[in-house]
Amino acid sequence: MMMFAVTAFSQQIYNIRVSSMEDGAFENMYGTIKIYGDVLNGKKDGAWVENHPNTDLPRFIINYKEDKKNGLFLEFDKQANLIKKIDYKNDMIDGCSYSWNKGGKIASKQEYKEGMLDGASVIYNDKGFMQEESGYKAGKRHGVTTWYLYDDRTQGPKYVMYNYNEGMFEGIQETYYEDGRVKTSKMFTNNVANGPAFEYYEDGSVKSECTYKNGEVKGKVKEYRKGERL
């Protein structure tokens, strides 16, 4: 086993160069931080670990194959709580990525493909309540994205829902009152407002309506009294 004592602050695992090192177990002290793993054919191989300063508690556990991140990436806080769990393939995030807030509450849950967001993405606030739910394709919003209300104790309803096509607004875009009724509604094509747009009162009756063409209002904006029938 190779051991070294180096006076330095913190050294991330991925900055360590092992190309000139012999095969076998590697262990190195960077000041008060211990980093260790295996070397095979001059490359990182298997699980590499970086501890928290002055402890034997892991901060990072990163799996390698031929010097590239492959498999699970794990990050822990000083109390040994898991705060990140990420799947890697060929040095890129590929699969699921999770993160947690202090106390173990979920902070994010996202799907990746070849290093880019691709699939479902859910973001939570520091209380563990959902604040954003999205779909992605090749790193761009794709499909429905919904934002939610919340307070310190309870999960609230959705208040915004947008439809995307490869990062651009496409289709109906809506906002909502706290009781779930539609507040505004507008149609988009290729990121430009096109078609009918409505604003509603809390009771669901139409407050105003108009029509957009290429991002501009065409014709008159019609306004209505609360409860008035069209």
Where are these regions (language model features)?
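Sec-dependent signal peptide recognition
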Residues: 1-2
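Periodic aromatic/glycine/histidine/acidic cluster detector
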Residues: 10-125, 129-201, 205-230
